[in-house]
Amino acid sequence: MEILWFIPTHGDARYLGSESDGRTADHLYFKQVAQAADRLGYTGVLLPTGRSCEDPWLTASALAGETKDLKFLVAVRPGLMQPSLAARMTSTLDRISDGRLLINVVAGGDPYELAGDGLFISHDERYEATDEFLTVWRRLLQGETVSYEGKHIKVENSNLLFPPQQEPHPPIYFGGSSQAGIEAAAKHTDVYLTWGEPPEQVKEKIERVKKQAAKEGRSVRFGIRLHVIARETEQEAWEAAERLISHLDDDTIAKAQAALSRYDSSGQQRMAVLHQGDRTKLEISPNLWAGIGLVRGGAGTALVGDPQTIADRIAEYQALGIESFIFSGYPHLEEAYYFAELVFPLLPFENDRTRKLQNKRGEAVGNTYFVKEKNA
């Protein structure tokens, strides 16, 4: 089992849709979140990509030197990056981070943003380009000299002089809910990622991916992307969820949904169907809440509850075959602590850092003793 957190390079806040409660999203804050995740024992962090985010490669490069064990899940963008350049970037960051790089393959889902970036190909063509990109990229990182000509990519005698630290290359994470996305992922990914859908939908998707991977003579692992709101009691958790969207008005939700409706991403369309823009029907499965998706693209659902309930819901996803969990919460610094301190002890997730986390003492009582020592 691995658990990753999230670096909010697109901004952070205590409330969605509120300017007054926003938090300055700069390198100092990113460093605070990354170092907290490193100290608490998270496996790694996801860095988002797109025009609303700081560049993930530069951000990860800056944070690698500020952390010790934390891994960085960073996006390659087929169609926007050439595979030879991406291979050099991958190899360099993997070496300077001492083998702590993970690769997130993002084909893109917003035609308007992609047009602004100079990419004018259809949804299915993006996955064709992704397949070609990863074919070349993987071969380069494995030390081959590559000549390749496809529909979207052509290289001649391309090679990589400095290999990555991880062999044969940093692990690949890849999500795509359409048939074209699943076919590309099945050929290349190490970990197939799904958005936080209800368990029955996740089960169906896992079966589709397994069958497609088997056709390629491969097996893949599975991961899920979710938000989380963990509190000591169910009531506190649901109150926190309601507070998070308490500043959202109907006009803001309508504008956000209109913007998200232009996406041609099957995954985004599946997220939108879960809540249909209706803030009165947000618990779409036990303890799975779609409130964040009212105004946020991509990951739009959260696990909400007390520690044991959240651990039980995670176990349900594990039983389906999910091994990698990528979480986030608003604001990201505080929620990293809430989740780690409350839920980690209930999960089959342990490393040297989580063991230190559990070997904790509170403030000295009466300048005389620590509570843990008294109760020992």
Curated annotation (Swiss-Prot):
Belongs to the SsuD family. GO terms for molecular function: alkanesulfonate monooxygenase activity. One of its GO terms (biological process) is alkanesulfonate catabolic process. It catalyses: an alkanesulfonate + FMNH2 + O2 = an aldehyde + FMN + sulfite + H2O + 2 H(+). It comes from Bacillus subtilis (strain 168). Its EC number is 1.14.14.5. The keyword Cell division does not apply. Induction: Repressed by sulfate or cysteine. This is Alkanesulfonate monooxygenase. Pfam families: Bac_luciferase (PF00296). The keyword Oxidoreductase applies.
